[in-house]
């Protein structure tokens, strides 16, 4: 039997350096990735190194609220 439907949830990862640069208006935009995570394995906020096309380098992308 299934233990629950809400184990895997869809999350949005946002570039942390673009958010900081947005105050200075240096960046052309904010990079965002959509992915899924398992709530039982990772209950805390997820942070991954992904490529940011606005910064032109790999940066830390953190989970944001919907």
From Swiss-Prot:
State the superkingdom: Eukaryota
* GO cellular component terms given for this protein: chloroplast; ribonucleoprotein complex; ribosome
Entry keyword Translocase: no
Give the Gene Ontology MF terms in alphabetical order: structural constituent of ribosome
Compartmental location? Plastid, Chloroplast
The UniProt keyword set, sorted, is: Chloroplast, Plastid, Ribonucleoprotein, Ribosomal protein
Name a single GO biological process. Answer: translation
Q: Which Gene3D superfamilies match?
A: Ribosomal protein L33
Pfam family membership, one? Ribosomal_L33
SUPFAM superfamilies per UniProt: Zn-binding ribosomal proteins (SSF57829)
Which PROSITE patterns does the record cross-reference, listed alphabetically? RIBOSOMAL_L33 (PS00582)
Annotated family: Belongs to the bacterial ribosomal protein bL33 family.
Alphabetized NCBIfam families for the sequence: PRK00504.1, PRK00595.1, rpmG_bact
How is this protein named in the record? Large ribosomal subunit protein bL33c
Organism listed in the record: Arabis hirsuta (Hairy rock-cress)
Query: What gene is it encoded by?
Result: rpl33
